[in-house]
Amino acid sequence: MTYFTIKSAAMSPDDDAPSPDINSLGRLMSHSEVESRGNGYEVLQQAGTVRILLSRPERGNALSLSLARDLTRLFQTFSAQHSVHRIVLTGKGKYFCSGMDLGEELYEDATERCLALQDLFGAIDACPKTTIAVINGPAFGGGVGLAFVCDIRVAVSTSFFCLSEVKLGLCPATVSRFIVREWGVSLARMAMLTARKIQPQTLHEMGVLHAVALDEEALEAVTRDVLNDLRFAAPQATAWCKVLTRKTRNANSDHDQLARQIFEAMVVAGSESEYGVAQFRLGNKNICWEQVECRHIG
């Protein structure tokens, strides 16, 4: 899929984060109810789409230790639910996510905190569902990792991405593997060393941001377009695509074996493809997979 900049009412980017009137998720889901709340997040679900809203705007949606653990549990739970096909992650207020919560005690529980963050990013990366980061504002440090560990990323033009840890004597230890994987070594290293703000247009031109919207309204529109496209993606095929792309990054002799295993699994009797090909032969090219019972997703 290729997405292009969607134009709406023009906004002038500012070095500082913009202050949107209301967050995009709230408008996008105005017809839905919040299904659950936690300490720093809200969850909404409609059909096969789950939306997770980071809701600590007074802290820039920073990742506290408890929030990191809660988000990990959410992604693990939704990964195992066959009724869930897509997971949207976005933020409330001015920021998408300002990274690790520096207001907490970092030095007494360093190992515990590191493991919690690794578990979070690992849970998102391994999630068999399609994950979409809807980046409503600036992202710092771990917030950059939170965006780019997701499969699809769309951002408002007034956002930016800053790996600012080096200014504090820190480094983006837990997210570096994902940033290097998605951005490439050269840009990732420069961003880490300089703490420079990386503009969304730069990442869009590289193909690692899949859309840049000029304002909140346009961000909602492009999110709807992405979700509409994903309605026709079979869940097991989606999970396999994600496994293959993860493994291909470190291609070795195991990849060919994995490819054979997946190919053999996807063409057996009772598989998704048996149903999908049969429907195609009947002229149905847009299958609503949410209405199809699947044997296994993972």
UniProtKB/Swiss-Prot annotation:
It is an enzyme of class 4 (lyase). Keywords: Lyase, Virulence. InterPro entries: ClpP/crotonase-like_dom_sf (IPR029045), Enoyl-CoA_hydra/iso (IPR001753), Enoyl-CoA_Hydratase/Isomerase (IPR051683). The keyword Lyase applies. Its EC number is 4.2.1.-. GO terms for molecular function: lyase activity. Gene3D superfamilies: 2-enoyl-CoA Hydratase, Chain A, domain 1. Disruption phenotype: Leads to drastic reduction of ACT-toxin production and disease severity after inoculation on detached leaves. Signal peptide: none annotated. Gene clusters encoding host-selective toxins (HSTs) are localized on conditionally dispensable chromosomes (CDCs), also called supernumerary chromosomes, where they are present in multiple copies. The CDCs are not essential for saprophytic growth but controls host-selective pathogenicity. Although conventional disruption could not be accomplished due to the high number of the copies identified in the genome, the high sequence identity among these copies is likely an advantage for RNA silencing, because it allows knockdown of all copies of this gene simultaneously. Belongs to the enoyl-CoA hydratase/isomerase family. Enoyl-CoA hydratase; part of the gene clusters that mediate the biosynthesis of the host-selective toxins (HSTs) ACT-toxins responsible for brown spot of tangerine disease by the tangerine pathotype which affects tangerines and mandarins. ACT-toxins consist of three moieties, 9,10-epoxy-8-hydroxy-9-methyl-decatrienoic acid (EDA), valine and a polyketide. ACT-toxin I is toxic to both citrus and pear; toxin II the 5''-deoxy derivative of ACT-toxin I, is highly toxic to pear and slightly toxic to citrus. This is Enoyl-CoA hydratase ACTT6. It comes from Alternaria alternata (Alternaria rot fungus). The lineage of its organism: Eukaryota, Fungi, Dikarya, Ascomycota, Pezizomycotina. The gene is ACTT6.
